[in-house]
A protein has these predicted regions:
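Long, low-complexity intrinsically disordered regions enriched in small/polar
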Residues: 1-26
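Long, low-complexity or tandemly repetitive, helically biased scaffold regions used
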Residues: 21-176
Length: 176
C-alpha cells in the first residue's frame, strides 16, 4: 500500500473527556473540585469562627487577624486565581474578600488588647463617647453584615449540605 499525503489515524475506544463534578446546580472541573477541597480545608474553620464571633463583645481571638492574613498572603492570594469556573471563582473571591474586610476591624482603631485569665484577647474600644459611637455606628453594623455575608457564602461553598433547604431570610436591619 502506497500512501501519499497526510494520514488520519483513529483510535478505537472512548473519546477522552474532561471530568466534571457536580457542585450544587452547576458542574465544575475535576481540577476546580480538588482546588475547592483544598480551599475548604484551609478556610472552613476560619469562616465558621468569623461567623460565630461577635466583634462587639469581649473575647475576640487575638490571633484572628493573623489567621486570616497569613492564609491569604502565603497561599491563596495567587492560588485563588486558578479556579476556572466563573461562579465558583466568584464565591471564592467573595469569601476571601469578606474575610479580608473583617481584618480592618481587628486593628487598633477598633480593638484593644485585654488580659484575661484565658490569655490575651481583643475587646472593642469603648472608653469614650466617640469610641462608643464608632462601636455602635460602624463596628457592629459592618461586622454583622460581613458575618451574614460569610454565612451565605459558606452555604454556597457547601451546596450538598444545604440541598433542598430554603434560603436564609434573616439579614441585618436594612439589608437583603
Amino acid at each position: 500500500m502506497n500512501i501519499n499525503g497526510p494520514v488520519n489515524v483513529y483510535l478505537a475506544g472512548e473519546a477522552v473527556k474532561s471530568e466534571v463534578v457536580p457542585f450544587g446546580e452547576i458542574t465544575i472541573s475535576l481540577e476546580d473540585s480538588k482546588l475547592l477541597e483544598e480551599f475548604k480545608k484551609d478556610y472552613d474553620e476560619l469562616v465558621i469562627k468569623c461567623i460565630k464571633t461577635d466583634f462587639t463583645v469581649p473575647g475576640v481571638d487575638i490571633n484572628l487577624y493573623d489567621e486570616i492574613n497569613i492564609s491569604y498572603r502565603e497561599k491563596w492570594d495567587v492560588k485563588m486565581l486558578k479556579f476556572k469556573n466563573k461562579e465558583l471563582r466568584r464565591i471564592i473571591f467573595d469569601t476571601i474578600g469578606a474575610l479580608n474586610d473583617l481584618t480592618q476591624y481587628l486593628t487598633d482603631e477598633y480593638m484593644r488588647v485585654l488580659e484575661t485569665p484565658h490569655g490575651l484577647e481583643l475587646i472593642a474600644r469603648n472608653q469614650s463617647w466617640e469610641q462608643g459611637c464608632k462601636l455602635r455606628e460602624v463596628l457592629r453594623p459592618q461586622t454583622t453584615k460581613l458575618r451574614y455575608k460569610l454565612r451565605d457564602l459558606y452555604r454556597e461553598l457547601h451546596p450538598e449540605e444545604y440541598e433542598g433547604m430554603p434560603p436564609f431570610d434573616d439579614y441585618p436591619e436594612g439589608e437583603e
